[in-house]
Structures are given as C-alpha cells and as structure tokens.
C-alpha cells in the first residue's frame, strides 16, 4: 500500500470466514442473536482512494449490480464526512475480487476499509471505538473489520473479543449462486435456539487438528441453505469428501482448512471444471489496523 498526502492505494479489504455460527435467539425487532468466531483472510477486494478538494465523494469504478448511491463504500465515506464535518472529498476505485452473496463479508469489509483509509487520508484520527460506533450503522459485520482482529462474536455480531488463532491455509469454494441473507434468516426451519457456548469452550479445542473445523460447533444456516440451493449442497459434499468442510455465513461459500499452502492448492487442483476456488492464508490482524488507535 502506498501512502501519500493525496492518495492511499492498494488497500486490502480482507474476506472473513465464520469458523462456526450458532443462532441462539431472535429479538423482538427481528434481529437474531448469534455466536461465531470471525477469521480474517489475506484475500479480498482492493480499494484505492484519491483526495478531492471539492468535497465530493465519488466511486469512479463501476460495480455491476450495485448502484453508486447504495454502495456501502460510498455510504461509509458520506457517513464519515457527515460525522466529522470534513471539507475533504474522495475518489474511490474498487477492484472487486470477492464474490457477492457468498458469506465472505465483501461489502462490509469494503465499507470498513473505507472508514479506516479515510480516517488516515482525511487526517481525522478518530479512535477505533468511534469508528466502530459509526460502522454499526452500515451493517452488523462492519464493526468486526474495524475491530481488526480475529474475534469471538456475540449479539448481532457487534460484541467482539479477540481470539488468537493458529496460522492455517484455507480453500474457499464459491458456487455460482447468490444466497440472500434475509431469505435464510426468515426461513421457518432455521434453528434459532442453539445452546450458548463460551469463548473458553472454543479456545479449549481450536488448536486441535482432529476433524477441524468439525471439532467445534456448526453453521446453523447450512442445513437451510443446502436444502434450498443444490449447488451449495453439491460443493459441501464434494469438499467434505476431501476434508472436513463448512459453509461460511449465510453462504454460498464453503471452506476447508489445511496445514500448508501446498495441501490447499492440491485440493484446489482437483476441483471440478467450472468451480470457483481460492486458496488464502489466515490473517491475525487487519492490514489497516494501524489506521485507528
């Protein structure tokens, strides 16, 4: 990433995985109480920011299917601008890498990277806690990316505690299907009463290689998604025949963990023709973590 007074380029917006995802309740407002562990990956979209002197926020690259005014990146920049009253503007370029509707947090991560990068580019120096409070207004996953560490998450995903995770390589396979999160959350067959676990429960097993990630918990959304989307079910079955695998978020991506890049790439090489798979290393910290204190 280059850093100057006029631009910040090559800012990674990393993907996340849900190593497990339990739904423990439903609130009167319709939101669900969750428990999960979020894992950052060294793989994601890349954003570039160039200072404007006219105060305008502009997305200068087209993102198919996402109008500029509703793009979380633009909304994040305008939210930060309104909150601080800065006279600065910005041109934002987005190199999309992560598939949308995949459970990888792509849009949320883009928004968080925007908040962090503009905190530096606009010389705002807002503390991390203040950025996280703003991030909640953009979506439940955005505060995690501002938090910037692998985390045990509770509530609707905004209650975060740092967890230390071992370095692993992941193969992430994404079927060619978009899974609407709201559709899965509203399904009457979705489990909403999973027993609560503790961070101690998770940490007691997370260093074990036996059956990981199946050695702890599950993704409560996976059964509903695979019953509705045959493509996701097919990927889960294929990957599980290679090594224990699990869906992330509300899908559609499915992941498996490996001890080495070589093992992950060997599995990737066996993917059926036409399947989209990416190999990525785990991260312990967001690449822009230092942009907030």
Swiss-Prot record:
Q: Give a yes or no for keyword Protein biosynthesis in this entry.
A: no
Signal peptide range? none
Pathway where this protein functions: Isoprenoid biosynthesis; isopentenyl diphosphate biosynthesis via DXP pathway; isopentenyl diphosphate from 1-deoxy-D-xylulose 5-phosphate: step 3/6
Active site at which residues? Answer: 16, 141
Give the keywords, sorted.
ATP-binding, Isoprene biosynthesis, Kinase, Nucleotide-binding, Transferase
- Any idea of its EC number? 2.7.1.148
Q: What is catalysed by this protein?
A: 4-CDP-2-C-methyl-D-erythritol + ATP = 4-CDP-2-C-methyl-D-erythritol 2-phosphate + ADP + H(+)
Can you cite a GO biological process for this protein? isopentenyl diphosphate biosynthetic process, methylerythritol 4-phosphate pathway
> Which residues does ATP bind?
99-109
Q: Does the keyword Nucleotide-binding apply?
A: yes
Which superkingdom heads the taxonomic lineage of this protein's source? Bacteria
* Single GO molecular function: ATP binding
Entry function: Catalyzes the phosphorylation of the position 2 hydroxy group of 4-diphosphocytidyl-2C-methyl-D-erythritol.
Query: According to its UniProt record, which protein family does this protein belong to?
Result: Belongs to the GHMP kinase family. IspE subfamily.
**NCBIfam families (alphabetical):** ispE, PRK14608.1
| Name listed for the protein in its UniProt record | 4-diphosphocytidyl-2-C-methyl-D-erythritol kinase
């Amino acid at each position: 990433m280059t850093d100057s007074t006029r631009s910040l380029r090559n800012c990674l917006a990393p993907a996340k995985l849900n190593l497990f995802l339990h739904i423990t309740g439903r609130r009167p407002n319709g939101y669900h109480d969750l428990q999960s562990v979020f894992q950052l990956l060294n793989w994601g979209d890349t954003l570039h920011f160039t200072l404007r002197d006219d105060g305008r926020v502009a997305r200068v690259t087209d993102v198919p299917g996402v109008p500029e005014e509703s793009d979380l990146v633009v909304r994040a920049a305008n939210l930060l601008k309104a909150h601080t009253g800065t006279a600065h503007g910005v041109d934002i370029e987005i190199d999309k890498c992560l598939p949308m509707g995949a459970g990888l947090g792509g849009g949320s991560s883009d928004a968080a990277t925007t908040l962090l990068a503009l905190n530096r580019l606009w010389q705002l120096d807002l503390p991390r806690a203040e950025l996280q409070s703003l991030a909640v207004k953009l979506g439940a996953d955005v505060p995690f990316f501002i938090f910037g560490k692998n985390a045990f998450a509770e509530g609707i995903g905004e209650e975060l505690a740092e967890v230390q995770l071992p370095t692993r390589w992941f193969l992430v396979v994404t079927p060619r299907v978009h899974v609407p999160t709201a559709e899965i959350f509203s399904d009457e067959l979705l489990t909403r009463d999973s027993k609560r676990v503790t961070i101690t429960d998770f940490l007691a097993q997370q260093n074990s290689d036996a059956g990981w990630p199946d050695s702890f918990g599950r993704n409560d959304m996976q059964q509903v998604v695979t019953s509705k989307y045959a493509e996701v079910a097919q990927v889960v079955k294929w990957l599980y025949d290679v090594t224990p695998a699990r869906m992330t978020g509300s899908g559609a991506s499915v992941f498996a963990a490996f001890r080495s890049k070589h093992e992950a790439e060997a599995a990737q090489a066996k993917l059926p023709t036409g399947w989209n798979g990416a190999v990525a290393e785990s991260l312990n910290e967001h690449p822009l973590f230092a942009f907030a204190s």
